[in-house]
């Protein structure tokens, strides 16, 4: 009887024509989960949509902007989902699977024009064998709800659906809503990052900070790298002036200063590499943005301390696009003013019954905004996914291959005017700070002997800060039985992360004459040199290494290092969770996280070269007139810090959390216990003379591995009777989080959270002698609201850190590298804010930003003396991004204009607050044209005003020193003006 009822009701729907209303409506809807997307479409079209929440649960609706008929707009919205629609009354449309039973694997039913009703045969009914008990009851509930919606205008749906089937997932109905209900565009968005179960959580209910971006929104940012994208997050300051790889990412109120120790980059919920505080490595350098990304979710703190890698900072989770029942794809080409040529592509569709696939990626080559006379960026990425759906869940496999080379950029010479907070920076003579860099054909190659009698080390700057990685993963989500679900995320990553770059060394430019005079003084102070040379030096000869021409004594020169680093990485992670519905509205999650990882490093730091202080520098040979050779083929010295180490780590964590909804309240609490085990070896080194000739000044004091090792192993340490040191290698720590959200209305909520997290020491921390575990206590309260024209999200926080290690390589007066280490705490208070206002139709005004008051405390060790109470290095007290955007409807096509003004406040480059980085502002803009349903043209530009913004001062200068000398300074500016033009075809 029930089956007959389903068929009768379904057949009554089939013969009803699609909307005959051919008038145009204006739509502006972003890519988002299908439920919220359909709700927003209903609101903007002023119609009723009826659909089952089960049916749309795993789908994403497409972005639509412009003027369309209701039928055309709905087709565009549902493009790629495999869903179809039928009219059931004058103002009501029902959403269905192509075959009417929710199976997305079959080809979608073509929707006829409004003037031509579909024949009944257009929607075949499958046999009863395809309908399990749960789906049958869900469909009956949906169809009863449909009858109520048609009869009563959609207002009696909820009660009838609940009466139909209390245990089935509640079908959803979207009706025209007033201004107060326009929250579905943002607050109804379902997020999966930082949540206990794979089903996710509405943003309205999340008791923590989360920022989301669709693929289209990611493109609008115009990010130069995966790190640069994080500027959409209110509390993130990403220093991306180093290029597509190798950034510094600062989180407001979190300690930092180098790399990105408090940022995890994940793919589909699995961290790419589970240790985040290694030198010459950050997660963002292992990831590239392209068309294979569906959306990004960035969570800051909150419940992140419980799940996955337990990141107490930010987790940027990138969800990959998957194939759907309806084949879709796109291909595009982008050209840029920096000599950029880039091709992107994506294709996804069905492979077999219940199987779906996707492939995509990019390839690009670029001269770079700072041209180096060879490709600055060259490489690409390929990603594939395979998804299988079955009655009780889904499994998705993915593979990602990244092979890329990126120019690494450090500090350049600048003119410093003024002092303290009044300092300003301008161009050094002959060196454009927006487009210049030392690298060029003359400095591209390195050949240097690093040990007595061994073959020379060779390296190429064109290999840059590269990545050669292979990543494989899978996500399994199963409904085990009533009230029990399972989620398992597995990922394996392996590959090579090399660094070949010029690192400026601790002293601003000086004239060749002044440099030679200092070298003469040093050589004459060495008795062995004077004896071998037959007396003291009184003069010098300097020539260009490339052509032998004499160098003018007034030419400015510098000594910069050609650093060569190789990191061989492997990691395996598994995140397994069971979620139990203990009783209605209460869910308990228990889980286990395992990470096994290794890093095999070989470093050659130093390799200092004497070069001109100009873009595309020339190497200089310098010889004193007593025969002493200061620089040979530009080299003033070989490796001053040679490191060979091998480390392995294993982290095992168990966690439990519970969420409980009580009327308008949603509470959650959880605890995590984690053990870390680390072992490894470091080869010791000895300072050696590479030959017996005292006149060869360039090969003295070379760091050479000597075959002896320091072993970091708990079992060995215990055998040697040093149990205290064993504690450095094996640690067990706990983390916890408690939060709650109160929903005042369906479009307004407030939340509060308290959590304590830990940050385990990395391999580098053990090597540097700072093996302590960091701790954070976080307190925050937030408020979210959305009306038809306004969205606001405000978070106020108090964060306390302890046991944070500090490490920096500084250059001594002799030119050698010294490793400066100490530990400290942090006291931080601040506010994050996100807002969007639409004062008139088509115009939106958006803002994101942060204000903070964060200072050092509890400094331990002389290296940080005097820093207590100082402002955290590199972090602005205030930063904000303001983006007005305007949509111009043009019939079947439309134009979108946007402009972004960014303000970055004053910062300090060092803990001693002596190296001041002035505030600056930038202006970015873009125009996007959607031409019909298939073509998109995008014109974007960044830093249009060519602002000189400095992100760091001399990275090798000791804390507490100004980093300037004689009006000269070193600093790393942001990139100058850049523009790109892209054309994409969608099919």
Give short role names for the model-derived ranges.
Residues 176-179, 191-195, 199-202, 207, ...:
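Extracytoplasmic beta-strand/coil segments of soluble accessory domains associated
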Residues 315-350, 359-372:
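Short strand-turn segments of transmembrane beta-barrel domains in outer membranes
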Residues 569-571, 581-597, 602-606, 610, ...:
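Structural signature of Gram-negative outer-membrane beta-barrels, strongest in the C-terminal barrel
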Residues 271-300, 424:
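Short acidic/polar hinge/loop motifs at secondary-structure boundaries
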Residues 376, 382-389, 394-471, 498-563, ...:
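Acidic/polar loop-and-plug regions of large Gram-negative outer-membrane beta-barrel proteins
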Residues 286-330, 986:
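A beta-strand signature from Gram-negative outer-membrane beta-barrel systems
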Residues 801-805, 842, 902-910, 928-987:
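C-terminal beta-signal and adjacent terminal beta-strands/loops
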